[in-house]
Amino acid sequence: MFHIEYDLRQDKHLTDTPLHFSIRKKEVNAMTCDEALYRQYLSGDDEGLNALMKKYGDPLTLYIDGYLHDVHEAEELMLDVFAYLFTKKPRIRDGGFKAYLYKAARHMALRHKSKRKPLFSLDALTGEPDGRLLAEEVIRTEERNRILHFCMSEMNPDYREVLYLTYFEDMSYAQAAEVTGKTVKQITNMVYRGKESLRRLLEREGITNAES
């Protein structure tokens, strides 16, 4: 579904190289585009919201699934998030659409999770990993990504969330702090600890070149 790089040797949030500024420029352009599409919807053109759903539908579902561990419920909740935008049409500050979207999704996921009856889940068991993940094919990108997803599922949920937001959703530490309700300092600390935890898990699965 998604192509994810697991090389943690470079932290885009802590570098001042020209590439860093190029990335930041792209982030600003992306945020501007999001706000333009949302304003397009507010002005009466549904294509704006359709474009936002197409852009964020899958990654938002994956984020929610990290809380619910049920992709079908996650898809329904993703639609609920956009339904909220349909009906309430909240005012969102410039540059804040993505953070607002994920913050709303997080709130709905936690509320939904608190209302569910406890269910026995095989995810809670510590079983032997699929042997295919430990075979020689691990050098192939598809296998590395599969191992990454497995290791992410084994992590502390708080660390997993901040790594997902900052690396896979390309959020700044400030945006991740807004989504999770934490401070930038806390996010910085959690990213560091999360990378160390992920590196150890990857090494356990035979990947030794994922340095933090």
Locate each region found by the language model.
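DNA-recognition helix of helix-turn-helix
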Residues: 174-204
